[in-house]
């Protein structure tokens, strides 16, 4: 891609974002990301926003359809359940295609060409995120593989972030937010999720005075999401304990709601 066409692709991606045509935004930013040159911060963020929007819409659709499927199943409506199942699988295929698309770009281009610690953390976090999205709906060996790869991405990002980025850095905080959601949602490890979220929050609080003005808003937003998740997960644990004692069914019915990512999502992720 020439310098001019790269500039054009970025401009068209911004235009697509304004028009809320996120598939077009993805195509333009994917062409920029595939040049084997380090992306600027702006380009990196445009790429993230593009994929986040196309995947976010389908994740929300999948949750709604899955919820309806469960309700129809409980009513014994077999014919409707079959129709819903086919529709859900169609959404899952779209989710799989999008995730595989960005994961290929990350593995072939972005991660190998990342020079700065910030970029490396950002891309390894994305690897963790998109394998996590696959693990949300996959079953059996595919779910295990997706969970393993997600963990690998988050761990690689965490090692670099801990060594190179300040505890108040928005990317490090966003990583902690998403990694803790991974432990809670995918590995069913609420204790580990709470530990990770609390550690990130406490470390950031202790260095709040050193927070730069430009990242203050982003950092404090993610810190609030970390705290919100801790509150939610703690109340979930208390309710589960009470429910177990009282033999109440349906104690764990808090589905994740959507919110911005890196950016962020309650059981929020960033």
Curated annotation (Swiss-Prot):
Q: Which Pfam families match?
A: 14-3-3
Sorted alphabetically, which Gene3D superfamilies does this protein's record hold?
14-3-3 domain
Return one Gene Ontology term, BP aspect.
Answer: signal transduction
Task: Kindly state which keywords UniProt assigns to this record, in alphabetical order.
Answer: Cell cycle, Cytoplasm, DNA damage, Meiosis, Phosphoprotein
Concerning InterPro entries, the annotation shows:
14-3-3, 14-3-3_CS, 14-3-3_dom_sf, 14-3-3_domain
User: Which SMART domains does the entry link to?
Assistant: 14_3_3
Modified-residue entries (Phosphoserine), positions: 34, 66
User: What protein family does this chain belong to?
Assistant: Belongs to the 14-3-3 family.
Q: What is this protein's record name?
A: Checkpoint signal transducer rad24
Question: From which source organism is this entry?
Answer: Schizosaccharomyces pombe (strain 972 / ATCC 24843) (Fission yeast)
Starting at the broadest rank, the lineage of the source organism is: Eukaryota, Fungi, Dikarya, Ascomycota, Taphrinomycotina
